[in-house]
C-alpha cells in the first residue's frame, strides 16, 4: 500500500504526522500544507493511495475541488483517512462520509490527540500532551513550547520532515539536539516580536479594536505574535497578514465566522483564510510597499466584520 500523509505545518500537524509514521513505520510521501492549499496537494496524490490527512479543516471555497480529488483517489482503489479538530459544518461531514472518507472530527482535543485516540497508537501520550498544550493554548506542558520552536525553526518541507521523523520517536525527553535548536530559535524569535510590536497598527471598528501586522514569510509562530499584540495593544482581534493568506486571533470574539465569510475556517478563537490579491496588490508586495498591502488586508477583514455584525461604524 502506498501511504501518503498530508498535514499542517505547525507542531500539532507535524506531531499528528509523526504518530501516523509511528503507527505504520513508513510513509511514501509527506506533504505539508495550509488548509487553503489542500486541494492542490490532493491533486498530486497518486491513484490507489492510502491518504492520511491530519490537522487540516475544510475551506469552503475549495471544498468542491477537495471532493473531486477524494473521489478520484477512492474510485481508483485508494482510501482516505481524515483526522481533525477544527469546526466543521455538518454538511461537509455528511458529504465526505457519503463519498467513503473515514473521517474523525473531535473538538475535545488537538489533532495529535484525535490521531492518538482513533488509531490507538501506544506510548504517545507525552507527544500528544505537548502538542495540545500549545495548539489549544492550554500552556500546561513546557515541552510544547520547546517542540513548537523546534518544528518552526526553519521553513520548508525538508526541515519539517526531519522534525516529523524526530517526533515519531519522542519519549518525553528534550534532548540536546532540540534544546540547541530552541536556543537559536529564541534569539530569532525575540527579534521578530520586537519588529512586530514596532510595526503593528491599530484600527477601530464600532468599538472593536483590531491590531494588524504583515508577517514575513520566514516568520513563524503566528499565535505567539498574535498573543503578544493582543496583550500589548489590549485589542479584541489580531489580524496577521501574509502573502496569500490571513490569520485571525481573539480572546473574546468568534473570528471563525469572519474567516468563514472569507472562504476559510478554523476555531472560534483562532481561524484563517486565503487571500487572493490582484496584480496591483501583488506588485505592491514584491516592490516592498508592504504598508499598502497590509492596509488592503485589514480592510478586507473590517469589511467582513461589518457584514457579520461583529462591529458597525
Label the predicted regions:
Residues 45-69, 73-74:
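Short, structured active-site "lid" loops
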Residues 2, 183-313:
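Gly/His-enriched, cation/cofactor- and phosphate-binding structural elements
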Residues 10, 20, 55, 84, ...:
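Divalent metal-coordination and catalytic microenvironments
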Residues 75-80:
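A short helix->loop->beta-strand "cap" motif at the edges of active sites that frequently abuts
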Residues 129, 136-223:
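Glycine-rich, Lys/Arg-enriched anion-binding loops that position phosphate/diphosphate groups
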Residues 2-46:
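Anionic-ligand anchoring segments at beta-strand to alpha-helix junctions in alpha/beta enzyme folds, i.e.
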Residues 36, 57-61, 217-219:
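Short acidic, S/G/P-rich loop/turn micro-motifs used as interaction or catalytic elements
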Residues 92-160:
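Short alpha-helices
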